[in-house]
Each structure stands twice: as C-alpha cells, then as structure tokens.
Regions:
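Basic, Lys/Arg-enriched C-terminal extension of HTH/homeodomain DNA-binding domains
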Residues: 198-225
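The feature encodes the CheY-like receiver
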Residues: 20, 60, 65-66
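Short amphipathic alpha-helix used as the core "switch/output" element in two-component signaling
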Residues: 48, 70-82
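Short, flexible helix-to-coil linker/hinge segments that flank and couple to helix-turn-helix
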Residues: 96-103, 108, 112-164, 214-220
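Active-site beta3 strand of CheY-like receiver
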Residues: 53-59
Length: 225
C-alpha cells in the first residue's frame, strides 16, 4: 500500500487557484514519500488525469467554477473499480459543499488554512486506507445542514459490538486506538469495521459516520459516547 514500507504516495492537485496549487506542491514536494504527479484547474480534467497518472490521493477544491469537487468525486467513486482517496479542500469548515462531497464519497476534508504538517499527515493518513475525520466538524456539518437519511442504519443488523466500534470510529479513533479502548486485538477491530461498512453499504469510515449521524444512531448535537 502507498505510504507503507517506504512506498511513495502519488498525489493529484485540483484547484482553480494557481497560487493554492503552488503552495500545496511546495509543501508536499518537501517530503520524500510524497510525489505530486500532476495538477488540474477544474474537475472536468480529473477523470482523465486519474486514469493516466493513477494517483493514490486526490487533493481537490470543493468549489470550482465549471465541474466542482462534488461532481468530480462522485464520478471517480462511481466509475472506477479502485478510485483514489479524495480529500476535499475548503475555506470554511461548515461549508455545505463539503457535506455533499462526503456523501459523494470523499474520504475527508481539509481547511485551506491547515498547517503544512497537518496537510502532510492528512495525505499519509488517507493513503494508509484510513479516513480523515474531524468528529466535531462532521457533527457541525450535519447539524448545520439539517439533513437526515433516516433509514441509513435501519435494518442494517449491526451487533452491539459493531455499534460500539462505529461510535469509536465517529470519535475519530484509528483501528489501533479502538483496539486499545476495547482491549481486543487489532485484527478483531478490523473485522468489526469491515462488517460495519459492509452492512451499511459504506465505501469507507467517513460514509459510515455520516450515515450514523444522519440516521440518528449518533446525535449530531452531542459528541458520540
């Protein structure tokens, strides 16, 4: 997997602001395990570039004048058997566009004012196959947008332990951290997380958490217990 055992993580930058792209490229180029494979100024360019360059991670502005980050993310997730991880970039944490991008299949989001170290860590995190979750921000997004899926978890048949694991995931914990909290093995947690995703029909942890909040399984007005 990219980012493990010294493997280089391939990245595609997508933003209509050339200065933003230049800043991101400078930050990422300073890291030996990160390689910016290409850039795009509009979401319409993304599918072709992804097929040609095969990036592991796409850093994409959520708001662009022609094809935005939401449409581009949705296209990648629905048209490719193994789409890259998508991190959407936004100026404001409560941007409704970000909420739509998460629903479309984005792995997480970053504020454009994030510190260089945070950007680098975010790319590495999602390249490992983990979702980039900021629990408070996700809660605020869902509470602010006021949208409810309602049926997302009904009939999913989650066991008590799977529900417990989902709540820990919603708090932003990694598999290793959940294993420590539950005093179980890492492989056991991975199995539970896999079962949760399969039962919810979720592509990744981010979509599972959004479904949990939307369905009322976790109240977006209060932190997950």
């Amino acid at each position: 997997m990219a980012g493990d055992d010294g493997a280089v993580i391939g990245i595609l930058l997508v933003d209509d602001d050339e200065l933003v792209r230049a800043g991101l490229r400078a930050i990422l180029a300073a890291e030996p395990d990160l390689d910016v494979l290409g850039e795009a100024s509009d979401g319409a360019e993304v599918p072709g570039l992804v097929r040609r360059l095969q990036p592991d991670v796409v850093l994409m502005d959520v708001r662009m004048p022609a094809v935005d980050g939401i449409a581009a993310t949705r296209h990648l997730v629905t048209s490719l058997p193994e789409p890259p991880r998508v991190l959407v970039l936004t100026t404001f944490g409560n941007d409704g566009y970000v909420y739509d991008a998460l629903q479309a299949g984005a792995t997480g989001f970053l504020l454009k004012r994030a510190r260089p170290a945070e950007i680098v860590q975010a790319v590495r995190t999602v390249a490992r196959g983990e979702s980039l979750l900021f629990p408070a921000a996700v809660r605020d997004l869902i509470a602010t947008q006021g949208r409810a899926g309602g049926d997302a978890l009904r009939g999913a048949g989650l066991t008590d332990r799977e529900g417990e694991v989902l709540r820990w995931v919603a708090r932003g914990l990694s598999n290793a951290e959940i294993a420590r909290e539950l005093v179980v093995g890492l492989e056991t947690v991975k199995t539970h997380v896999g079962n949760v995703l399969a039962k919810l029909g979720a592509r990744d942890r981010t979509q599972a958490v959004v479904a949990a909040y939307e369905s009322g399984f976790i109240d977006p007005r209060r932190p997950p217990e």
